[in-house]
From Swiss-Prot:
Protein name per Swiss-Prot or TrEMBL: Trigger factor
Residue ranges of domain PPIase FKBP-type in the record: 163-248
Job of this protein: Involved in protein export. Acts as a chaperone by maintaining the newly synthesized protein in an open conformation. Functions as a peptidyl-prolyl cis-trans isomerase.
PROSITE patterns given in the database record: FKBP_PPIASE (PS50059)
Record-level GO BP terms: 'de novo' cotranslational protein folding; cell division; chaperone-mediated protein folding; protein transport; protein unfolding
Transmembrane spans: none
Length: 427
């Protein structure tokens, strides 16, 4: 294989490489054997057409595209490795020569990893806005939240207040004409919940069961249904029931209802205090790690971050988001329709995050390289076993999914993050 690389501009260049006849000939034979199985040529049994007859009738060149498809991926990877390149985006491939009997010549326009000029990344001073101390108010808030979850809705005779739930029928119209989606029956609406458009819930406060209220609202200019956006609507709303939330007494019985492992309210408070302390400690560590890494990234200089890297990160994020939707049974088209957004909007939403994450990854990789971090076979095996335990998989499954190079990369990245974080001090 002949390989050359020509820099065209910062982080961009053209990689030229060849696929030799020593590789082409056996692949031609393999492709021919596969193709001839389906050929029907008069005078020959199906699958028994001699190669010389095939070449004369169809031409050897008719096999070239299949041969190229088979050989190109490995040839490209080998060329990148031989040229010592770190390619960070999909290449633009061009086959410049596929002459019979000659080595084939391919060019690839590639984007390479940008240079990272590290600044200070050890012994950093950082600020974090996370409290480690657990207060009585924290514990009480946690218990109150659980207490509210056990609350029951009871019918009240008095007028509705914020926080109450009303059961209503409503019919919406614009200029006296009803519109699609503007009608509901026996709908339970929490006042103050923000379920309905601004102003709707407020106009039901102070009214009682049996009343009919003309609710006048204006749809927001950015409302998802464009035919309603910015328009004033009237909702004739009948209140059937007003319900208030009735919370259980704050006592030992409540504690048992919340958590069957405790006997008293004091036990529950102590348990929650320990859980909150552990959670706050973890949040504090995460905050220190985030602040230290952010500072290391700010101190570094990345020489012309390629847009392609950001685009690929955005693409990964969008695909991950849409994949999560589908796993929850939500069709992406339906999501865009409900939210009034497009796939382009989603890409734009992830743009800044993708740029930040790309810069962070580059700096951490540069730290790992500068420190000469590596991963031993023992460390790789330990990582495999940990992943298998975390995801309830067999060790062999993890090894099939992740290559040794991928595992080694992850381990060195963890070491770099640990170095940046462990040497940082909080102001």
């Amino acid at each position: 294989m002949s390989v050359s690389f020509e820099n065209k501009e910062t982080n961009r260049g053209v990689l030229t490489f060849t696929i030799s006849q020593d590789q082409i000939k056996p692949e031609l034979d393999r492709v021919f054997k596969s193709v001839k199985k389906s050929l029907n040529v008069p005078g020959f049994r199906k699958g028994h057409l001699p190669r010389p007859i095939f070449d004369k009738k169809f031409g050897e060149e008719s096999l070239y595209q299949d041969v190229m498809n088979a050989l190109l991926p490995n040839a490209y990877e080998a060329a990148v490795k031989e040229a010592g390149l770190e390619v960070v985006a999909q290449p633009k491939i061009d086959v410049t020569s596929m002459e019979k009997g000659q080595d084939w010549v391919i060019t690839a326009e590639v984007v390479t990893k940008p240079e990272v000029k590290l600044g200070d990344y050890k012994n950093l001073e950082v600020s974090v806005d996370v409290e480690k101390e657990v207060t009585d108010a924290d514990v009480e808030e946690r218990i109150e939240r659980e207490r509210n979850n056990l609350a029951e809705l009871v019918i009240k005779e008095a007028a509705a207040e914020n926080g109450d739930t009303v059961v209503i029928d409503f019919v919406g119209s614009i200029d006296g004409v009803e519109f699609d989606g503007g009608k509901g029956e026996n709908f339970s609406l929490g006042l103050g919940s923000g379920q309905f458009i601004p102003g709707f819930e407020d106009q039901l406060v102070g009214h009682s069961a049996g009343e009919t209220v003309d609710v006048i609202v204006t749809f927001p200019e950015d409302y998802q249904a464009e035919d309603l956006a910015g328009k004033e609507a009237q909702f004739v709303t009948t209140i059937h029931e007003v319900k208030a939330k009735e919370v259980p007494a704050l006592d030992d019985e409540l504690a048992k209802d919340i958590d069957e492992e405790v006997e008293t309210l004091a036990d529950l408070k102590e348990k929650y205090r320990k859980e909150l302390a552990a959670a706050k400690e973890e949040a504090y560590k995460d905050a220190v790690e985030g602040a230290a890494i952010d500072t290391a990234v700010e101190n570094a200089e990345i020489v012309e971050l390629p847009e392609e890297m950001i685009h690929e990160e955005v693409h990964r994020s969008v695909n991950e988001f849409l994949g999560n939707l589908q796993r929850q049974g939500i069709n992406p088209d339906m999501y865009f329709q409900i939210t009034g957004t497009t796939q382009e909007d989603l890409h734009n939403q992830y743009q800044a995050e993708a740029e930040s994450r790309t810069k962070t990854n580059l700096v951490i990789e540069a730290v790992a390289k500068a420190e000469g971090f590596d991963a031993s076979e023992e460390e790789i095996q330990k990582e495999v076993e940990q992943l298998a335990a975390d995801y309830n998989m067999e060790v062999a499954q993890v090894q099939n999914l992740l290559s040794a190079d991928m595992l080694k990369h992850d381990i060195t990245i963890k070491k770099a993050v640990e170095l940046i974080t462990s040497t940082a001090t909080v102001k």
